Amino acid sequence: MKNIIIWLLLIALVSCSDKSEVNYEISSVNLLKTVSYLSSKELQGRLGGSKEYFEAANFMAKEFAEIGLIPFNKNSYFQNLKVEYNQILPKAEFSLYKDRNFVKKYNLGKDYVFRGFSGAGDINAQVVFAGYGISIPEYDDYKNVDVKGKIVLAFKYNPSWNLEGVKWSSSLPREKARVALEHGAIGIMFVSFPNDEKPQEPIGSTMHGNGEQVNIPQIHINLPVANEFIEGSKYTLKELQTKIDSEKTSLSFALKSEAKIFVETEYVKEKVTVNVIGIYPGTDEKLKDEFVILGAHLDHVGGQSGEIYFPGANDNASGSAAVLEVARMFAKNELETKRSVMFVLFSNEESGLEGAEFLANNLGFDSNKVTAMLNMDCIAHGDSIQLGNGKSAPKLWELAKSIDSTNAKLTINGTWAGGGADASPFHEKGIPILYFVTKFSYTHLHCLTDKVETLNPKLYEGITNLAYLTTLKLAKGEYEREVIAERVK
């Protein structure tokens, strides 16, 4: 980071001429061109730490270099960090058997997906329904059933109800898989709640939870598939959830079906990945060592088995392309700013905000030097703009709202307290945050359908322009860092 200060001293030459004239303008054409590449089959969903993620990172670093941003780390735009990594390798299989006889093979992507941190395995065994997959003294889905050498079918999430004085364990898949393994299971299948108004379809996800890797197959199946496994039992899946929820007691039993699951994985406990960071230097003698951070996560949830990939156009190729486009606005128009701007593309948001957490703790300077952090995540699908964290940084929120009121006028009033996603690690350090997102942005979240053609070009251009104008005002010194009004951990 010392080199940044040196670069700032060398490059930040104060000009007497007015450099406020804008020649390069934000364009949805340029934004969507970048999104199209980042969400392409070539980049296979940009799984953090993967070869394809590094292709995306190198592409963005090259763009940073071409517009003249200063590298964050000596001569590199990369900030290295180590993350847990898991890749689903070719070729996978998931099939239904009855009485040990093959019935049907399911389609990856349509009928099921592997959890991002699924273990490997080649198994064919009876399936046992185990409710919520919880095993604690006060409530035990495993107490009256033998799952040794079998495959567990469990609801993906924990109950919406509580028992007095009882705190549920984590509902993340690693914890449920760990519990299943401890009881002797050799695999686990997750299904969404059948009684939800819109039960969640299988989605790509690398969010796994704490603890060691659980090396058994872990898959998320859709409701029709789950019902085919339940078929022949006393209850339907809907009836099972209703009965368990109403009586608040476990109801587990062996099913009259078997599952064959084959999956190979490449698991690495510590794999190197990178944040991509470029600096636009400020010129004011007093303020140039202060930073405005504009960030978005570059990673998504990857692909599986060489058969499918999750494009991640809105999540978050849109935010990444917007960071690049705003950087171009500053650099190509040679805008003169008092503060410096740090343009950041984070790795591994999807597995737990790891890139953002790493940068927040390894800035190379006091975090009090960060005037504000602006985060862009899922900003191109929907119909309006929402600015998060307004309850924690009301002055910053009002500033952005006032800018929008004289421009696109797309912002709604709703906001929240706290950071959210990659903004959270910075919020926890007391840094004012603004979270740019769009209303109704999650229609295709982590789905195979999150493609560039689902995006709203006009909205996308508008929110990117708002992020640019807000960043510019902060960089010009028209906002002073405020004390966080409402802290959320």
Whereabouts are the PLM-identified features?
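Extracellular/luminal Protease-associated
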Residues: 20, 107-217, 281, 310, ...
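Soluble metallo-hydrolase cores and metallopeptidase-like ectodomains found primarily
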Residues: 99, 111-144, 213-312, 328-332
